[in-house]
Amino acid sequence: MLETDILIIGAGPAGSMAAKHAALNGAEVLLIDRKSEIGSPKRCAEGVSKDGLKRLEVTPDPRWIASEINKVRLVSPNGTDVLLDEDKVKLSEVGYVLERKVFDKHLAMDAARAGAQIMVKTLATSMEKEKDGIIVHLEHMGNPMEIKAKIVIGADGPESRVGRWAGLKTGLKPGNMESCAQFEMVGVDMKQPGCLELVFGSVAPGGYAWIFPKGEDIANVGLGVLSTKTDKTAYQHLLEFVDTYPGTQKAQPVELNVGGDPVAGLHKELVTDHVLITGDAAGM
């Protein structure tokens, strides 16, 4: 049986940052991810604030920055249109739209350079508590294996299985999880360069629609809805939105992403014996 100080399950930004800093502080770290490629498929609109990167001590790199955001356009349910400009008002949304597939790999590589080991195509299937640690059962490339860790960090996304196995309450009610669908599109008509657009109202019941620019005519166009507020799927709402919104009527999709987004906020319990959860797994 393999042994390590810290086993981190999930190599998204939260998992990779945890791996990096644990390794920098002298821990033996193993970071695993169930996918064969870290960062793929992307799971969000790819926006990040400058303040967020600064807090994480991540230096912006043109290799993973698609565009810089300095304006926000808000469209209310009654159609009122408000443009907020960084030059006139402080905006928490000011930052970048990323290439998440590149960004996530960049963070994982930083963790590796700090001393963390990484295993891809590795799925955690169960775990058992012992007095001095946790035994985690894994499947690596379809082959079973076991790892004993002093600490397990669950960075495995919404409704974390790691948290549930540890007895933490990570389940979410339907009203606490938005269903999301997003196209990356080309041919988007964006009137304001560097402007993030948020559209509220019936286009996305219980949530909102977004346009995150990634280039001159390229953008992530998506929305999130609450299943308690609509009988349609997020994908159906997305198709209706891109067909009717002026900036996207002539655009074409080159990628589709679907998934869930927790909106309930931070879970009450994040830590138990030898286990903690972080990132979306913790409701962050």
Model-identified regions with their sequence ranges:
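Beta1/beta-strand and adjacent pyrophosphate-binding region of the FAD-binding site
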Residues: M1-A14
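Predominantly flavin-linked oxidoreductase catalytic cores and closely associated redox partners
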Residues: A11, N25, M109-Q249, H267, ...
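Glycine-rich FAD pyrophosphate-binding loop
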Residues: A23-R43
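Glycine-rich phosphate/pyrophosphate-binding beta-alpha loops
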Residues: R43-E46, Y208, A281-M284
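A conserved beta-strand/loop capping segment in the N-terminal third of enzymes
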Residues: D51-H106
